Structure formats: C-alpha cells, structure tokens
C-alpha cells in the first residue's frame, strides 16, 4: 500500500520549508528512520527522516521548491502502510486538538515530573522525532524535550520515551545536528534557474531561496521598525595589535586561533553593562522595554547561502581564548550549513565584521528586536598625532548603529567611547573581569 508522507512540523514554529536536497529517488529501498531530504526554513537546514520502511514510489516535490507543512512530498510503498496512517501531519494536528479538549489521566499522574522538567528543560531546544513519537510522549505525559534520543542523529524513538518513563536518560547529552553539503545550493540554483531567449541583453531568473527570503524580511522589518542612527569612529589599536601578537603563539599551543574579534566582544559586553539601554528590546506595541540581564553576542557570519548570526552565549563569563574558540567553531558550522536554530537564538547585541572583507565604515542594520549593532572595519596603517608628532599606527574603523527610539545620541557615543578606550588599551579588559 502506498504511504503518503507529508512534510511534518519540525517543531520550529515554521509552517513551510524549501526542499534543499533529496537523498532518495523513485525505486530506492529505504528503512525506517533513513534520511529522506534536507529542508531549509528561516532558521536552519533540517534532515527529514522516513517513518516507514519500503520502496520509494514517487517524489512529488522538486528540489528548490517550497512545501507547506502537511503537503504530501513523497509516496512510499510500505508493507505496514495501513498501520502507519497515524504518522504525518494530519494526525499530529488532531492529537493537538484532543489535548486542548481534555486532559489525559496519565498527564495528571506525571504532573510532578512535568513541573520538575519545566525548571530544567530548555523549551527552545530542537527535537528530532516523528509525529507518532511526539503523540506517544504526550499521551504518556512526557515532555519530549527532556528525553535523550538514541536513534540515528539523536532522533527520539518510542523506546526512548519508555526508558524515560522508567527513570532513564534525560535531555542531557542530547544533540541536534543538521547537515548541508556545499553542493546543495548549486543543485538548487541549477534546477531553479531558467534561461530566457538570448539577445543583446541575456538574463536568467531563479526562485528566491528560503534563506534569502528570511534575510530580506528581517532587514526590511528592522529598517521599517527602528529609526537607525549610525556613529562612525576610529581608534589607534597599536597596543591591541601588540597584545594579540604576544599571546598568539601561546593560544596556538593550546589549539586556539586568536583573532581581534574576541577582544571586541569583551569590549562590547563591557559597554552593554555600563550603558544597559543598549542591552534591551523596545516593544512599542506593548508599551514595554525588555531589560536583559544576560549578555549574549551575535556574530554575523558571511556564508555561501547568506548572512547567518550564530550567538556566543554568556560572553561575560568567558575568557578571550574561550570566546575565540567558540567563534571559530560557530563560523565553521555556519559555512558548512550545520548551525542549529538554538545556536542562532538569544542574542542581546550583534557584531558585524566588514573588515574581514576589506571594508572600513558602513551602516550595519540592527538585528531586530535588538537595539544596537557594532560594525568593525579593517585595521589600516594611518598617520596619527602622538606626543606632538605624526606617526604611523594601526587604526581600527568602528560603526555603531542604534535604535533612536530607545537610545539617545549621547548614550550611543558614550558607549562608542567606552569601546574605543578598551580597544586602545586592552589591558583594561582584565580590570573588567
């Protein structure tokens, strides 16, 4: 019997996704839990597993096409298809409705367990599980985000739910991984690009990729919502240059690639603490300002697929070396398409580095709902006046954009001056803790 597999809700609050790459084709024999496709949403690339074993009859959605949750994307000739009818979007939605109408007795029995989970489980965590497993967890009163998956790529199975009910493993050690081959974007472009008749001015057209749509939406929303003001400045970083040179070899001995960026992260965190208005969110509709008592720094990363912003969490608690390692790891994940949505959430302020591309000053766009973004340009040798003499020194270009609804010009410049002071004399960062 043919089993119609529908694009499932992957738990990110996203209702559609672009089919980036199929790993199967008509005629292939597959096993349950084999990866069928990679789907890209606004946040990340996610692997979609098969809920059944069988033979692929037909792939219904081409690579590069956007499918909506619930759409049939592939048909599989599965011997147990009749028993598997509950798997997929439809039944999952029905079970959600049933939950709202009545509470399960099992859930009442597990209430003490659930209350404990609420204090320990990261509710924003991405879960890999089929709809049937999610339903099974709900029926047994288990928060699926507290369960450690033992399946392929950390996928959660019914056996994992049973083990959890019997006092087994929790979410500790659970990992969500996504994979994306560098050639996938080429495949999408090749399939989506259509050549028009040749002439004096030949053109081609292609569908806008999901990632580019997400970036465009975020940029337009930020510029339309927040009145941007950008301050541009520069600072002599000779001592910073020498400090990094002094510790570069020491860092390398322990496997750390030391760059200037971790220094900027620490300087920005210090500025956010001294001028907390920059570490807020401005909600005009609700009439509220959200004050954030944590310091997570987003690092804008340029990739082949577009701009991604992985986040260094609790940057105030980490050393220069630790931040350097984390930035390098996140950058590799970004380039390889392996960032999870969790690694791109929770930033309180962002850094954009145009200097790595040879740029100097620019007007970085705020990563809404944040209220500020620090842009760093290249370090260039320039003439400066020092002790009454003109000398050459390495000078760093800085650009600070902020939301003028929340931050006044003087506050923005004072924050910029504080950052300049720390980068001019990096030993002061030791005094910051």
UniProtKB/Swiss-Prot annotation:
**Cofactor dependency:** (R)-lipoate
What InterPro entries does the record point to? 2-oxoA_DH_lipoyl-BS (IPR003016), 2-oxoacid_DH_actylTfrase (IPR001078), 2-oxoacid_DH_E2_comp (IPR050743), Biotin_lipoyl (IPR000089), CAT-like_dom_sf (IPR023213), E3-bd_dom_sf (IPR036625), PSBD (IPR004167), Single_hybrid_motif (IPR011053)
Every copy of the Peripheral subunit-binding (PSBD) domain together lies at: 128-165
Task: Tell me what this protein is called.
Answer: Dihydrolipoyllysine-residue acetyltransferase component of pyruvate dehydrogenase complex
Q: Name one GO cellular component term.
A: cytoplasm
Q: Which UniProt keywords apply?
A: Acyltransferase, Lipoyl, Transferase
Stretches with biased composition (Basic and acidic residues):
84-103, 117-126
The subunit field of the Swiss-Prot or TrEMBL record says: Forms a 24-polypeptide structural core with octahedral symmetry.
Task: Say which species the protein is native to.
Answer: Staphylococcus epidermidis (strain ATCC 12228 / FDA PCI 1200)
Chain residue ranges for the region called Disordered: 80-134, 164-204
Stated EC number for the protein is 2.3.1.12
Q: How is its cofactor bound, per UniProt?
A: Binds 1 lipoyl cofactor covalently.
Q: Where does the Lipoyl-binding domain lie?
A: 2-77
Q: Report the top EC class in one word.
A: transferase
The PTM N6-lipoyllysine maps to: 43
